[in-house]
Amino acid sequence: MTKLTARQQQVFDLIRRAIERTGFPPTRAEIAAELGFSSANSAEEHLRALARKGVIELAAGASRGIRLLAGPEDSPHQFTLPHASIMQLSLPLIGRVAAGSPILAQEHISQHYACDPALFSSKPDYLLKVRGLSMRDAGIFDGDLLAVQKRSEAKDGQIIIARLGDDVTVKRLKRRPNGLELIAENPDYENIFVETGSAEFALEGIAVGLIRPGEF
């Protein structure tokens, strides 16, 4: 394993925590803000140093195109992820979802995107076009394409895609003693509480990456 400087270790740990918490890596601007760098360019320099040492892989042209490859020497979180395949993924883009129909129903698919697997923390099943700003403070904006992996269960703190009655929503999951709280990452939006066993709630999947239009 490669020895990292103290600052490089901070950047590496920040990326790892972001992936564990949200399913996708931080942007250069988010790294700079979190670690007190003067600009996103400073974060980029540290990312390139980590890439040269072989502990991350960078996908050109993508603000969140960071993939962890291995844990550095003496890290308490040593691990190795399979290297990204050279084959691109063909992912359906889901636009608006009609009430009562499966999210991957043919009529919901507006087009397909060819995507580099290195953009995602896990293999996604589809892309969902984000509508609204309820997850703004998590770096998810209106018009972004959220990479979703289909799941029937999710961990506390993960960003999930869920059905609530006839609506599909993106929120952060928080488990409560008598149900679930779906947390908005924007103080202008209210959180949503779902009682245990509610027939109105169905988990569709978890976020494993994000693509901003113009990054293709």
Swiss-Prot record:
Organism: Paraburkholderia phytofirmans (strain DSM 17436 / LMG 22146 / PsJN) (Burkholderia phytofirmans)
GO MF term set: DNA binding; serine-type endopeptidase activity
Catalytically driven reaction(s): Hydrolysis of Ala-|-Gly bond in repressor LexA
Gene responsible for this protein: lexA
Keywords: Autocatalytic cleavage, DNA damage, DNA repair, DNA replication, DNA-binding, Hydrolase, Repressor, SOS response, Transcription, Transcription regulation
Protein name per its UniProtKB record: LexA repressor
Record InterPro entries: LexA, LexA-like, LexA/Signal_pep-like_sf, LexA_DNA-bd_dom, LexA_repressor, Peptidase_S24_LexA, Peptidase_S24_S26A/B/C, WH-like_DNA-bd_sf
Subunit structure: Homodimer.
Enzyme superclass (EC): hydrolase
Pfam families in the record: LexA_DNA_bind (PF01726), Peptidase_S24 (PF00717)
